[in-house]
Design a protein with these regions (language model features):
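Conserved beta-strand-loop-alpha-helix hinge in the C-terminal portion
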Residues: 215-233
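ABC family nucleotide-binding domain
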Residues: 2-211
Length: 233
């Protein structure tokens, strides 16, 4: 069995008298330590997949296997523990606590899990050793996003889920953030899943899952993923 598997997953929403199918018979596998890009236009169903993998929503049909456990069968309490202990989230907007320093924001991870990584070391890993005591307002957008990545990574999660992590960043800063995520996969063995509409990012991934109209249309394995340093997008 693969590290992550979605099997015949459906997610439906009721809007008035209309049923919206957000995920239709979604199937794919992800191996441990891969950097994966889920690619598709707005409304393709990719963020719904991310919400299901992260335990933020429940599917209506199908199985979602993470490291040997079918989280689709989890109770509400089990899903809460799963989100807290096993998943790191990185979003387009940074969601940092404004009156806490960079180090204190990352230290929040130690209040959630018992085996949190050292905040100073994680911030050093993302290139912010010199910014430990700065507040979010004193940081650039790219630096704030790196703090949010450090906070997610400090939980030592099984999977790192990223929803358009470079969407609010300029080109050069976006490349810096993507390099951190690629290094997390290659050097730290993290399983990183990035949701994006930007198809030019596909070459950096080990696996690219193409979504369209709520379904997986294609899965491409990159035998030789491109280094982010050499990517132009």
């Amino acid at each position: 069995m693969a590290y992550i598997e979605m099997k015949h997953c459906y997610k439906r929403y009721q809007v008035g008298d209309t049923e919206i199918v957000a995920n239709r018979d979604v199937n794919f596998e992800i191996e441990k330590g891969e950097l994966v890009i889920i690619l598709g236009a707005s409304g393709a169903g990719k963020s719904t997949v991310l919400n299901l993998l992260g335990g933020m929503d429940t599917n209506d049909e199908g199985e979602i296997w993470i490291d040997g456990a079918n989280i689709a069968d989890y109770s509400s309490h089990q899903r809460t523990n799963y989100r807290r202990n096993d998943v790191g989230f990185v979003f387009q907007f940074y969601n940092l606590v404004s009156n806490l320093t960079a180090k204190e924001n990352v230290e929040l991870a130690s209040e959630i899990v018992t085996d949190a990584l050292n905040p100073e070391q994680v911030l050093t890993d993302v290139g912010l050793a010199h910014r430990l005591n700065n507040f979010p307002a004193q940081l650039s957008g790219g630096e704030q996003q790196r703090v949010s990545i450090a906070r997610a990574v400090a939980k030592n999660p099984k999977i790192l889920l990223c929803d358009e992590p470079t969407g609010a960043l300029d080109y050069q800063t976006g490349k810096q953030v993507l390099k951190i995520l690629q290094d997390m996969s290659r050097q730290k063995g993290a399983t990183v899943i990035i949701v994006t509409h930007n198809s030019s990012l596909a070459p950096i991934a080990d696996r690219v899952i193409h979504m369209h109209d709520a379904s997986v249309k294609d899965v491409v394995i990159n035998q030789h993923p491109q280094d982010i340093d050499s990517l132009e997008y």
